[in-house]
């Protein structure tokens, strides 16, 4: 079964960064407990522009993890599957 991934982009004003980071810690804990991997990157040339990746071993696991997440992503139906090369 191919691994699956969702992507979420966010622009966070500097005044909201502490709240955003706290939310990310909660999400990381949730996805870890759901056997998913969760990464967040910030664009180096545009402070406050973030991209979040959530990965699971199956689309079902990823869908369930998003459905039960404490914070919703904008479009959980946009799921990417790993391509075999």
Predicted regions and their residues:
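Short S/T/G/P-rich N-terminal loop/turn motif that feeds into the first structured element of a domain
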Residues: 1-85
């Amino acid at each position: 079964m191919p691994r699956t991934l969702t992507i979420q982009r966010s622009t966070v004003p500097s005044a909201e960064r502490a709240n955003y980071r706290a939310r990310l810690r909660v999400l990381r804990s949730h996805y870890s407990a759901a056997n998913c991997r969760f990464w967040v990157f910030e664009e180096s040339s545009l402070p406050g522009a973030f991209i979040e990746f959530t990965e699971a071993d199956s689309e079902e696991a990823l869908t369930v993890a998003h459905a039960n997440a404490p914070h919703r992503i904008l479009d959980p139906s946009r799921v990417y599957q790993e391509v075999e090369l």
